Amino acid sequence: VHELTPAIIREAAARALGEDRGPADITTMACVASEVRAEARIFAKEACVLAGLPVAEQVFREQDPGLRLESAARDGALLHPGDTALKISGSAASILTAERCALNFIQQLSGVATRTRLFVDAVAGTSCQILDTRKTVPGLRALQKYAVRCGGGTNHRFGLYDMFLLKDNHLALMGPGATLADAVGAARSLKPEARVEVEVDRLDQIAEVLTLQVDQILLDNMTLEQMRDAVSLIAGRAKTEASGNMTLERVRDVAATGVDFISVGALTHSVRAIDFSLEMLV
């Protein structure tokens, strides 16, 4: 598991706030005196799984270390409409300047966590785990994968460096006469401690893969019947992952085939933001 470290949080908050604020928040400078004090809260306007609160808090700290922050919930918690996530007090100008950036993080990451929880709940009672993918917003992978965990999902490989995933293009570009055994052997030699996964899209490919003692087999765009047959053929000799067009409507049926994992790109690549708002209390 790749933890969401304080360094990652600080970097993300500073980069995002700098992008939004630029040299100065000119509207707030023109309208709000620096000595004005205020209290505010960030609250959910719809039911959701909260994620991104530590990043939102860091945005406020980055803008003004003198702001007082009081968390009213923790990431991973289920919020109902009207529930408070965070209370902020101090300089009114600082609160206004940091507001949008802080909300952006909470809205986007809570969207990921909430979407993930829907998929996790859909396969409840089976042994199947919901995986994320590398289909993340550039620059936000650590945050999005953290949000997947907040929603009860499991992280797949974090990047191209921590797990092998051999696909047909890799084999085709190895050179004339290269075999799957050659590819697996090269992977084992390069990084023996890393897990090796091989993608298949036909049942007749499985027998050869099993002779190579790989860790995981990705079943790409197979029908439910093909997945059931694949799980039977593999018989626990490797972990199984179903991938391709995974929707909430069919994910339960896919889990029922007996696969160990279902990877869902939609957890991160096209998530709807959750509606949060900041309300000034004073």
Protein language model features and the residues they cover:
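Short, charged, intrinsically disordered terminal tails
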Residues: A266-V282
